[in-house]
């Protein structure tokens, strides 16, 4: 993950490996998204870059989309190990207050995460930055009512929100 913000001019001038190293992290452990978006340079706006990355995700095979979903960590779940989270995920989960859960709340979240994962075969994904611990718990419970196809679509939409925020943070 880049520490200092980059300009679009800098990104547009980069070769593919440098471009991927600078923005590939925006889509959790899925640099292939940035690799595909690089083809659409030059980007006039951050929205152009985001749109290119979304095109790559939405045109990917169902298997690649599922791999992207599965690359995401559980939100405050028992399976979460802080050392395994990316810096961005750690910061986003902390911002939603997930690092401040009581033992009871953490156990409840872990049970919901496990049920979700058992039901759908992938982790529950929600843009933590736009939520707090309570709204995350409520969304998790409500989304257990969805079909697997609905949840794949919702998860990709949440990944899109996460990617947009991360790109906005990284690019001036």
PLM feature segments, named:
Residues 19:
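Surface-exposed, charge/polar-rich loops and edge strands
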Residues 4, 8-13, 25-27, 32-112, ...:
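Aromatic-anchored, charged helix-turn/loop surface patch used as a conserved interaction hotspot
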Residues 101-172:
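C-terminal non-catalytic interaction appendages of large macromolecular assemblies
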């Amino acid at each position: 993950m880049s520490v200092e913000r980059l300009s679009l001019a800098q990104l547009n001038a980069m070769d593919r490996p440098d471009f991927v190293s600078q923005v590939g992290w925006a889509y959790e452990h899925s640099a292939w998204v940035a690799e595909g978006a690089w083809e659409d340079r030059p980007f006039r706006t951050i929205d152009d870059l985001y749109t290119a990355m979304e095109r790559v995700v939405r045109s990917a095979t169902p298997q690649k989309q599922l791999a992207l979903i599965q690359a995401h960590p559980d939100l405050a779940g028992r399976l979460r190990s802080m050392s395994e989270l990316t810096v961005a995920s750690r910061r986003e989960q902390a911002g939603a207050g997930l690092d401040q859960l009581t033992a009871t709340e953490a156990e409840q979240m872990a049970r919901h995460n496990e049920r979700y994962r058992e039901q759908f075969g992938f982790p529950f994904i929600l843009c933590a930055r736009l939520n707090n611990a309570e709204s995350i718990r409520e969304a998790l419970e409500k989304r257990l009512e969805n079909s697997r196809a609905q949840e794949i679509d919702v998860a990709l939409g949440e990944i899109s929100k996460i990617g947009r925020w991360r790109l906005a943070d990284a690019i001036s």
